[in-house]
UniProtKB/Swiss-Prot annotation:
Source species of the chain: Pseudomonas putida (strain GB-1)
Catalytic residues in the record: D44, E116
Stored PANTHER family: DICER-RELATED (PTHR14950), ENDORIBONUCLEASE DICER (PTHR14950:SF37)
Catalytic activity: Endonucleolytic cleavage to 5'-phosphomonoester
Subunit structure, as described in the record: Homodimer.
The enzyme's E.C. designation: 3.1.26.3
Sequence ranges assigned to domain RNase III in this UniProt record: 5-127
Any single Gene Ontology cellular-component annotation: cytoplasm
GO biological process: mRNA processing; rRNA processing; tRNA processing
Keyword tRNA processing in record: yes
SMART domains: DSRM, RIBOc
Full protein name: Ribonuclease 3
Source taxon at top rank: Bacteria
Cofactor(s) needed by this chain: Mg(2+)
């Protein structure tokens, strides 16, 4: 085993019994021969399961929609690429000459895919418990920053993502009334969601605020949020 791979193993916190599994996980499809796409597929499935299982246990009061959003934050490419950079993973990737020249070792998608491939490789090299332990260790800081309140996304975005996850039509917003003087108006908006029998309503000093209030009301009516999230 080369010294460089040994350094990577120390960073990952795992020593491979089968070095070939590790090398394959680090091999991009632009490189000649076999590549890490199958391992990436396996690692992605393991990552989603482990993250989902941990969230299920960590947030016993969370609804399905909340758990889905939290998991999406944990397993998104940006998060995985950040972890990969912490391991200096780009230095160990096997890339084709074209990909190497174009800076593929820095590309978010390539780094994230390689990290997922390493998860799959660890599972095959050891077992599920070992893969779970490594995933949870790598994501420990990410878990610490999670709360049920996702302050990074507004109600309209959360509602849209919830509906898209179920292949539903996007919500429709309509201003049904405007009251008050031009300098002090109140907008009244209705939000129509295909999964709800009744339209959700919101009001605010601008159309945008009224739509956000209506979207928040729709999320509560859908049971995705309880009003205290």
């Amino acid at each position: 085993m080369t010294a460089s791979l040994a350094r990577l193993e120390r960073k990952l916190g795992y020593t491979f019994k089968n070095q070939d599994q590790m090398l394959l996980a680090l091999t991009h499809r632009s490189y000649a021969g076999r590549n890490n796409e199958r391992l990436e597929f396996l690692g992605d499935a393991i990552l989603n399961f482990v993250a989902g299982e941990a969230l299920f246990e960590r947030f016993p009061q969370a609804r399905e929609g909340q758990l889905s959003r939290l998991r999406a934050r944990l397993v998104k490419g940006e998060t995985l690429a950040r972890l990969a950079r912490g391991f200096d993973l780009g230095e160990y990737l096997r890339l084709g000459s074209g990909e190497l020249k174009s800076g593929g070792f820095r590309r978010e998608s390539i780094l994230a895919d390689a990290l997922e491939a390493l998860i799959g490789a660890i599972y095959l090299d050891a077992d599920m418990d070992t893969a779970r332990e490594r995933v949870l260790a790598w994501l420990a800081d990410e878990f610490e920053g999670l709360t049920l309140v996702d302050t990074n996304k507004d109600p309209k975005t959360r509602l849209q993502e919830f509906l898209q996850s179920r292949s539903c039509e996007l919500p429709r917003y309509e201003v049904v009334d405007i009251q008050g003087e031009p300098h002090c108006r109140t907008f009244f908006v209705e939000c129509e969601v295909v999964l709800l029998n009744n339209k959700s309503r919101g009001q605010g000093v601008s159309r945008r605020i009224a739509e956000q209030v209506a979207a928040a009301s729709a999320l509560i009516a859908l049971g995705v949020e309880n009003g205290n999230d």
